[in-house]
Amino acid sequence: LTPAAALKVSTLNFLHRVRPTHFLKKVLMTNRNPEALQAFAGKVSNSVTGGLNCALTMIGDQLGLYRSLAEKGPMQSGGLAEATHLSERWVREWLYQQACIGQIEYDETADSFFLSEEGKAVLAQEDHPAYMGGMIQSVVAMFDTVEHLPECFRSGLGQSFDDKGEGCACGIERMSRKFQTDYLVPALLPRLDGITERLTAGASVADVGCGGATSTIAMAKAFPASKFIGYDISLHALERARANIAAAGVSNIKLHNPTVDPLPEDSSIDFITTFDVVHDSTHPRQLIDAIKNSLKRDGSWLCADVKGLPTFAENRRDNPMATLAYSFSVLVCMSAGLSTP
């Protein structure tokens, strides 16, 4: 059998083993609405498939499989394994899964695999606005923490960002990197009255919840006369920030952990930024008050945060991102916000 034929046969055999026709018919017949039961079971099955695919997509991202396909074009499993210095058998099975789910294209005649232009953008080109490797990485990093969620539900206390591990911090940093490096300084800051002029002249800036400091670095490079302080309570994020700052070669950034070195209360800061921070805060009112007290009377606060609709009913009906947003909330955002009493 060719690999393509073997894939079809093995898939059919697997489906026959796990879902025998006579058994499925019997189950459906016991339900008053077998079509609805089958549709609902299919919906849940798709969710299971999506969860498994997240893990395998992260593998493709971390091992450079997508990048190699994007750069070298159509390849058979042996060629991709050789290009990435990986085991052919493992690469072959991964390619079969990726082709079945539709993330990688398959040419039966040539028995080769390749990425569409859309696939390259979403899976291989980290500088593309549609790239999703960071999101996938952060989602997979949450898997290890799921076993702790039952206790969160019982106690009401959530998990901090550091409880999610370094992978979550890295994934979130990668998710926001494109905006912070390519959009923040050239496109967003000029829309704020007087900000670029003030930063050019030299200002005191606090990037609160700086994460890996990609936004801090972008501003520090563009405005060398200004002094920047990145604040974050995540030790994983601060470690990444130190490494990123060193790699960028900027000298006008300092890093503080606000649990040790909080924002100043002397109204000495010209400009404060928060990017997707307030909704994750354990005490948002205290954070807002601290920001207010640290700003000069003519200072400015750039607050970018999650955009939702006023009610759950509206979000469920009209917000296409509602499912993703609520999923992230339970696993990360609300959990972090409830991580301290």
Whereabouts are the PLM-identified features?
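Class I SAM-dependent methyltransferase SAM/SAH-binding core
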Residues: 206, 216-261
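A short acidic, Gly/Pro-enriched loop at the edge of an enzyme's catalytic core
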Residues: 261-272
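C-terminal alpha-helical "lid/dimerization" subdomain adjacent to the S-adenosyl-L-methionine
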Residues: 304-341
